[in-house]
């Protein structure tokens, strides 16, 4: 029986602002990892409601509420907007 779900992130190719470094990945208001350009990461989480956002160069993306079911994967892409703010969107 599967008792976890997964939140997956993919960060595509870089623009000039992206070259400044890694995004911090925040799930449930805790920094759990970082993600570099052209990197993918997956995080096992308990089923239920979670809150996801990114931090980059002192800026924060909009917080997204994610409902994760057991055995399911919720996928997102991350990038920077042209003005440098991190952006998180469903894949």
What are these regions (language model features)?
Residues 1-91:
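Short loop/turn and low-complexity linker motifs enriched in small/turn-promoting residues
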């Amino acid at each position: 029986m599967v008792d976890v779900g997964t939140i997956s992130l993919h960060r595509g190719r870089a623009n000039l602002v992206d070259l400044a470094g890694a995004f911090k990945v925040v799930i449930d208001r805790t920094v759990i990892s970082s993600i570099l350009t052209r990197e993918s990461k997956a995080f096992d989480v308990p089923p239920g409601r979670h809150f996801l956002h990114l931090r980059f160069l002192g800026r924060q993306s909009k917080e997204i509420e994610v409902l994760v079911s057991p055995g399911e994967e919720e996928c997102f892409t991350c990038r920077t907007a042209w003005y440098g703010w991190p952006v998180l969107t469903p894949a």
